[in-house]
Amino acid sequence: SECLVGSEMCIRDSIKVRRFVRYEGVCSAYVHGGGTHGILVNFETTNGIEAKDEFATYGKDIAMQVAAANPGYVDEASVPAEVVAKEKEIMLAQMAGDPKTANKPEAVKQKMIEGKIKKFFKENCLVDQEFVKDGDLTVAQYTAKVAKDLGGDIKIVKFTRFQKGEGLEKRADDFAAEVASMVK
Protein backbone atom coordinates (compact mmCIF):
# COMPACT_ATOMS: atom_id res chain seq x y z
CA SER A 1 0.00 0.00 0.00
CA GLU A 2 2.77 2.44 0.94
CA CYS A 3 4.62 1.50 -2.25
CA LEU A 4 1.55 2.31 -4.34
CA VAL A 5 1.01 5.66 -2.63
CA GLY A 6 4.67 6.53 -3.20
CA SER A 7 4.42 5.56 -6.85
CA GLU A 8 1.22 7.54 -7.30
CA MET A 9 2.90 10.61 -5.86
CA CYS A 10 5.86 10.20 -8.22
CA ILE A 11 3.93 9.63 -11.45
CA ARG A 12 0.88 11.69 -10.41
CA ASP A 13 -1.65 9.09 -11.47
CA SER A 14 -3.86 6.57 -9.73
CA ILE A 15 -2.58 2.99 -9.68
CA LYS A 16 -4.92 0.05 -9.18
CA VAL A 17 -3.64 -3.50 -8.74
CA ARG A 18 -6.19 -5.65 -10.56
CA ARG A 19 -4.52 -9.04 -10.15
CA PHE A 20 -1.49 -10.54 -8.49
CA VAL A 21 -0.08 -13.82 -7.31
CA ARG A 22 2.20 -14.57 -4.38
CA TYR A 23 4.42 -17.62 -4.09
CA GLU A 24 6.53 -18.76 -1.15
CA GLY A 25 10.08 -19.99 -1.67
CA VAL A 26 12.33 -19.88 -4.71
CA CYS A 27 10.89 -17.91 -7.64
CA SER A 28 12.01 -16.47 -10.95
CA ALA A 29 10.24 -13.57 -12.60
CA TYR A 30 10.37 -12.42 -16.19
CA VAL A 31 8.67 -9.61 -18.10
CA HIS A 32 8.52 -10.25 -21.83
CA GLY A 33 8.28 -7.96 -24.82
CA GLY A 34 8.00 -4.53 -23.26
CA GLY A 35 5.47 -5.66 -20.69
CA THR A 36 3.15 -7.73 -22.88
CA HIS A 37 3.59 -10.78 -20.63
CA GLY A 38 4.66 -11.21 -17.02
CA ILE A 39 5.70 -14.62 -15.73
CA LEU A 40 6.41 -15.90 -12.22
CA VAL A 41 7.73 -19.44 -11.77
CA ASN A 42 7.98 -21.20 -8.39
CA PHE A 43 10.63 -23.88 -7.75
CA GLU A 44 11.69 -26.34 -5.05
CA THR A 45 15.45 -26.80 -4.83
CA THR A 46 18.00 -28.64 -2.68
CA ASN A 47 21.58 -27.96 -1.55
CA GLY A 48 21.19 -24.18 -1.82
CA ILE A 49 21.57 -24.19 -5.60
CA GLU A 50 19.10 -21.31 -5.92
CA ALA A 51 21.86 -18.96 -4.73
CA LYS A 52 24.06 -19.74 -7.74
CA ASP A 53 24.14 -17.46 -10.80
CA GLU A 54 23.53 -20.45 -13.07
CA PHE A 55 20.21 -21.07 -11.32
CA ALA A 56 19.14 -17.47 -12.00
CA THR A 57 19.85 -18.07 -15.70
CA TYR A 58 17.93 -21.35 -15.56
CA GLY A 59 14.96 -19.66 -13.85
CA LYS A 60 14.85 -16.94 -16.51
CA ASP A 61 15.04 -19.60 -19.24
CA ILE A 62 12.05 -21.45 -17.77
CA ALA A 63 10.07 -18.21 -17.41
CA MET A 64 10.89 -17.38 -21.04
CA GLN A 65 9.66 -20.86 -22.01
CA VAL A 66 6.34 -20.11 -20.29
CA ALA A 67 6.13 -16.77 -22.11
CA ALA A 68 6.89 -18.30 -25.51
CA ALA A 69 5.04 -21.63 -25.39
CA ASN A 70 2.13 -20.69 -23.10
CA PRO A 71 1.69 -24.07 -21.38
CA GLY A 72 -1.47 -24.62 -19.40
CA TYR A 73 -0.04 -26.99 -16.79
CA VAL A 74 3.26 -27.88 -15.12
CA ASP A 75 3.06 -31.63 -15.78
CA GLU A 76 0.65 -34.44 -16.67
CA ALA A 77 -0.35 -34.91 -13.01
CA SER A 78 -1.57 -31.30 -12.81
CA VAL A 79 -3.97 -31.67 -15.76
CA PRO A 80 -7.49 -32.16 -14.33
CA ALA A 81 -9.16 -35.47 -15.22
CA GLU A 82 -12.13 -33.52 -16.64
CA VAL A 83 -9.84 -31.81 -19.17
CA VAL A 84 -8.39 -35.15 -20.32
CA ALA A 85 -11.89 -36.66 -20.54
CA LYS A 86 -13.12 -33.67 -22.58
CA GLU A 87 -10.15 -33.98 -24.96
CA LYS A 88 -10.87 -37.69 -25.44
CA GLU A 89 -14.53 -36.90 -26.10
CA ILE A 90 -13.56 -34.35 -28.76
CA MET A 91 -11.15 -36.80 -30.37
CA LEU A 92 -13.80 -39.56 -30.49
CA ALA A 93 -16.27 -37.15 -32.11
CA GLN A 94 -13.66 -36.16 -34.70
CA MET A 95 -12.95 -39.82 -35.47
CA ALA A 96 -16.66 -40.59 -35.83
CA GLY A 97 -17.04 -37.75 -38.33
CA ASP A 98 -13.96 -38.71 -40.35
CA PRO A 99 -14.66 -41.39 -42.99
CA LYS A 100 -11.05 -42.63 -42.74
CA THR A 101 -11.33 -43.50 -39.04
CA ALA A 102 -15.06 -44.02 -38.49
CA ASN A 103 -15.00 -47.72 -39.43
CA LYS A 104 -11.79 -48.66 -37.62
CA PRO A 105 -11.96 -51.19 -34.76
CA GLU A 106 -12.41 -49.77 -31.26
CA ALA A 107 -8.96 -51.01 -30.15
CA VAL A 108 -7.32 -49.07 -33.00
CA LYS A 109 -9.30 -45.95 -32.11
CA GLN A 110 -8.17 -46.23 -28.47
CA LYS A 111 -4.51 -46.49 -29.55
CA MET A 112 -4.96 -43.42 -31.75
CA ILE A 113 -6.51 -41.52 -28.84
CA GLU A 114 -3.61 -42.53 -26.54
CA GLY A 115 -1.19 -41.07 -29.07
CA LYS A 116 -3.21 -37.87 -29.40
CA ILE A 117 -3.41 -37.49 -25.60
CA LYS A 118 0.39 -37.86 -25.38
CA LYS A 119 0.66 -35.11 -28.00
CA PHE A 120 -1.78 -32.97 -25.96
CA PHE A 121 0.44 -33.39 -22.87
CA LYS A 122 3.56 -32.57 -24.89
CA GLU A 123 1.99 -29.33 -26.12
CA ASN A 124 0.26 -28.25 -22.88
CA CYS A 125 2.51 -29.45 -20.03
CA LEU A 126 5.58 -27.30 -19.35
CA VAL A 127 7.95 -30.14 -18.43
CA ASP A 128 6.99 -32.16 -21.53
CA GLN A 129 7.44 -29.29 -23.98
CA GLU A 130 10.36 -28.99 -26.34
CA PHE A 131 12.78 -26.49 -24.79
CA VAL A 132 12.68 -23.33 -26.94
CA LYS A 133 16.40 -22.61 -26.60
CA ASP A 134 17.45 -26.17 -27.52
CA GLY A 135 15.01 -28.23 -29.55
CA ASP A 136 16.90 -31.44 -28.75
CA LEU A 137 15.80 -31.25 -25.08
CA THR A 138 12.49 -31.16 -23.26
CA VAL A 139 12.09 -28.77 -20.34
CA ALA A 140 12.32 -31.78 -17.97
CA GLN A 141 15.63 -32.86 -19.55
CA TYR A 142 16.99 -29.30 -19.37
CA THR A 143 15.93 -29.10 -15.71
CA ALA A 144 17.64 -32.42 -14.89
CA LYS A 145 20.82 -31.30 -16.68
CA VAL A 146 20.99 -27.99 -14.81
CA ALA A 147 20.23 -29.69 -11.48
CA LYS A 148 23.03 -32.20 -12.06
CA ASP A 149 25.47 -29.45 -13.08
CA LEU A 150 24.62 -27.43 -9.96
CA GLY A 151 24.74 -30.44 -7.62
CA GLY A 152 21.15 -30.49 -6.39
CA ASP A 153 17.56 -31.11 -7.36
CA ILE A 154 15.11 -28.75 -9.04
CA LYS A 155 11.36 -29.16 -9.25
CA ILE A 156 9.09 -26.73 -11.07
CA VAL A 157 6.15 -26.38 -8.67
CA LYS A 158 3.86 -23.87 -10.40
CA PHE A 159 3.82 -20.83 -12.61
CA THR A 160 1.60 -17.89 -13.48
CA ARG A 161 1.54 -16.10 -16.81
CA PHE A 162 -0.16 -12.72 -16.99
CA GLN A 163 -0.88 -11.17 -20.37
CA LYS A 164 -1.40 -7.45 -20.76
CA GLY A 165 -5.13 -6.69 -20.86
CA GLU A 166 -6.11 -10.28 -20.04
CA GLY A 167 -9.17 -10.52 -17.84
CA LEU A 168 -9.99 -6.85 -18.08
CA GLU A 169 -13.58 -6.17 -19.06
CA LYS A 170 -14.15 -3.69 -21.85
CA ARG A 171 -16.72 -1.10 -20.94
CA ALA A 172 -19.56 -1.02 -23.40
CA ASP A 173 -21.16 2.39 -23.09
CA ASP A 174 -24.22 3.58 -24.92
CA PHE A 175 -23.02 6.77 -26.59
CA ALA A 176 -26.53 8.26 -26.78
CA ALA A 177 -27.09 7.66 -23.06
CA GLU A 178 -23.70 9.20 -22.27
CA VAL A 179 -24.55 12.37 -24.23
CA ALA A 180 -28.00 12.51 -22.63
CA SER A 181 -26.46 12.28 -19.15
CA MET A 182 -24.10 15.17 -19.96
CA VAL A 183 -26.95 17.38 -21.20
CA LYS A 184 -28.97 16.98 -18.00
Please report, for each region that a protein language model flagged, where it lies by residue.
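N-terminal assembly/interaction segments in proteins that build large macromolecular machines
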Residues: 1, 7-184
